């Protein structure tokens, strides 16, 4: 079974080699809002949080980065990157949701491609709420 653990900002540099490939895959399919090195800095400065999935041998099998955003009507846990092996399961999501509730979070959201959206729906009970369009200027 995979258990979810938070990585304190002080330990980002110690675990970085174990998580960077998981996060890089997600960053590369993103919208170029940040690079992998920039994400590392955001984590180290505590602007975002690193959550890891660890197996029974304490081996990191996946990683997720999140940012808590306060909107007028919701406190949202926004997933900025996610990757790993077997880390999108209902058991793992329940652990993430339990932690998020302790932080006062009322919603979890993520930007993702269509295939990723299907996985979020199937494994974690997400709903497609809106489509994001973008144009570079």
Listing of model-derived features with the role each one plays in the protein:
Residues 1, 5-12, 111-137:
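Terminal substrate-recognition subdomain of acyl/acetyltransferases
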Residues 3, 20, 48-52, 62-65, ...:
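Ordered hydrophobic segments in well-structured contexts
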Residues 29-48:
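Active-site rim helix/loop that mediates acceptor-substrate recognition in acyltransferases
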Residues 40-41, 67-69, 98:
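Short, flexible, glycine/charge-rich loop motifs used to bind or transfer phosphoryl groups or to couple energy/partner
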Residues 53-61, 93-97, 119-126, 135-137:
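Solvent-exposed, well-ordered amphipathic alpha-helical segments
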Residues 74-123:
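Acyl-donor binding region in acyl/amide transferases
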């Amino acid at each position: 079974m995979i258990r979810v653990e938070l990585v304190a900002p002080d330990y980002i540099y110690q675990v970085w080699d174990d998580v960077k490939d998981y996060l890089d895959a997600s960053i590369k399919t993103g919208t170029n809002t940040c690079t992998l090195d920039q994400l590392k800095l955001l984590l180290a400065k505590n602007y975002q949080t690193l959550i890891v999935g660890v197996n029974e041998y304490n081996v990191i099998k996946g990683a997720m980065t999140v940012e808590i955003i306060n909107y007028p009507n919701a406190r949202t846990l926004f997933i900025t990157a996610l990757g790993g092996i077997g880390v999108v399961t209902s058991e793992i999501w329940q652990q993430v949701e339990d932690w998020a509730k302790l932080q006062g979070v009322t919603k979890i959201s993520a930007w993702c491609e269509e295939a990723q959206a299907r996985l979020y729906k199937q494994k974690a009970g997400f709903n497609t709420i809106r489509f994001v369009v973008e144009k570079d200027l």
